Amino acid sequence: MKKVEDYVRSIPDFPEKGIIFRDITTVIQSPEGLKLAIDGINEKLKGVDYDVVVGPESRGFIFGVPVAYANGKGFVPVRKKGKLPCETISQDYKLEYGTATIEMHKDAIVPGQKVVIVDDLIATGGTTEAIIKLIEQLGGEVVKIIFLIELEGLKGREKLSGYDVDAVIKYAGK
């Protein structure tokens, strides 16, 4: 029986020498791979009390929406600056070279809501750290953070200490 990691395509030396790029397009192109990915995330949510799923553009949408749907929850998108039509709050975060900004609608999280963040991959943790700040600024409580893939060598989990973080697949390297 295949596991979800069997559907992840590993590309050596991309985008640079010494890096193994973990490509999830092969997971979502396969009905079996996609089902295993969503089922794996849902398995990590068993027993978690939450109200809403939050996911960042764009791959957080791919995994977050079906998880929200399967569990009878709503989904809140986090987008790049300037992509949401109503009043937003924003948070800057660091990239390898420079900064980026993400936004969420100001009315997306109700104070006291219990939130699960779902995304495809954690590397350095910077994007997720910014998402947490947005949620908490609106009065939400992050009760679980789930990734399909964790690149343990990049130590992103350390930025998220104090939160319940899990991953379906863990790779030791970068």
What are these regions (language model features)?
Residues 1-52, 100:
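Active-site-facing substrate-recognition patch
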Residues 6, 129-174:
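PRPP-dependent phosphoribosyltransferase catalytic core
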Residues 50-66:
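Charged, well-structured alpha/beta interaction segments
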Residues 51, 113, 143:
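Conserved acidic residues
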